[in-house]
Curated annotation (Swiss-Prot):
ATP-binding (A) component of a common energy-coupling factor (ECF) ABC-transporter complex. Unlike classic ABC transporters this ECF transporter provides the energy necessary to transport a number of different substrates. The gene is ecfA2. Forms a stable energy-coupling factor (ECF) transporter complex composed of 2 membrane-embedded substrate-binding proteins (S component), 2 ATP-binding proteins (A component) and 2 transmembrane proteins (T component). This is Energy-coupling factor transporter ATP-binding protein EcfA2. ATP binds at residues 40-47. It is found in: Cell membrane.
Length: 289
């Protein structure tokens, strides 16, 4: 689904002494099937932005379009329920939202509330489990008896059981160790391509934005600060420093190598291990002193 924000502002407690502009005059487009990273510090407007995508928040000014759905200051569209079935949101620490007696009931909760029949729900669960790295042996277990990582995967399965066309991820790797972060992002990348989704993820991890996103949008104090292809945006060190953000470590690594050895090695979405191997090959080949 195509997504667009046109001059969108959201004002908390408007016309009161506590008025606060969470986002201001945001305009951008997200093409169907793309992966977009939203980056910014706490208070930059990231969470408010993504809450507009399924109508949890309605613009104070401007217009949001998600496919054929339109959200503006006139209020929520009449078919808001349909919109929410098509936009799946995985909030931070989604495992905290588990509540049913069994894993199966938790995953089935959303589809049941949207009138999906039992047979269809069973088929959806069976197809989703491998995608999130779970086996059917967990279905009759209490979600509260699972490990933290398994709980998160169950919560994600519950969102995917709705068969969304848009997947919104709010800090999907929060609280995970480096290995868990890598596994989680690899899983989402696979799901994105397997199900042909439009995916938006909020992140503080510049490496993930560089590796997985087709587009990066950086927010600062509720306004769009930068937008573009990841490599073009995330290598602009001086501009990023204006909003207390750093370039990805892999870009720093390549830039320092190129400066030291007068080379022109270019980042092409390789791992740091592969890049180091290429550097060694060049140096061993005597290309540089």
């Amino acid at each position: 689904m195509d997504i667009s924000f046109k001059n969108v502002s959201y004002i908390y407690q408007e016309n009161t002494p506590f008025e606060h502009r969470a986002i201001e005059d945001l305009s951008f487009t997200i093409g169907s099937g793309s992966i977009v990273a939203i980056i910014g510090h706490t208070g930059s407007g990231k969470s408010t932005l993504i809450q507009h995508l399924n109508g949890l928040t309605i613009p104070s000014r401007g217009e949001v379009r998600v496919g054929d759905f339109v959200l503006n200051q006139d209020g929520k569209p009449k078919d808001i329920r349909n919109l929410r079935s098509k936009v799946g949101v995985v909030f931070q620490y989604p495992e905290h939202q588990l509540f049913e007696e069994t894993v199966q009931k938790d995953i089935a909760f959303g589809p049941q509330n949207f009138g999906v029949n039992e047979q269809e729900i069973k088929e959806r669960i069976a197809s989703i489990l491998p995608s999130v790295g779970l086996s059917d042996s967990v279905l009759e277990r209490s979600p509260f008896d699972l490990s933290g990582g398994q709980k998160r995967r169950v919560a994600i399965a519950g969102v995917l059981a709705m068969k969304p066309q848009v997947l919104v991820l709010d800090e999907p790797t929060a609280g995970l160790d480096p290995r868990g972060q890598k596994e989680m992002m690899t899983m989402f990348d696979h799901i994105h391509h397997e199900q042909n989704l439009t995916t938006i993820f909020v992140t503080h991890n510049m490496e993930d934005a560089l590796k997985y996103a087709d587009k990066v949008i950086i927010l600062n104090k509720g306004q769009k600060f930068m937008e573009g292809k990841p490599l073009e945006v995330l290598r602009q060190r001086e501009k990023l420093q204006q909003v207390q953000l750093d370039t990805p470590e892999v870009i720093d690594f390549i830039d320092k190598y190129n400066h030291r050895f007068h080379d022109n090695l270019i980042y092409q979405n390789e791992s740091i291990v592969d890049i180091a191997a290429e550097m060694k090959r060049r140096l061993d080949g005597g290309q540089h002193e």
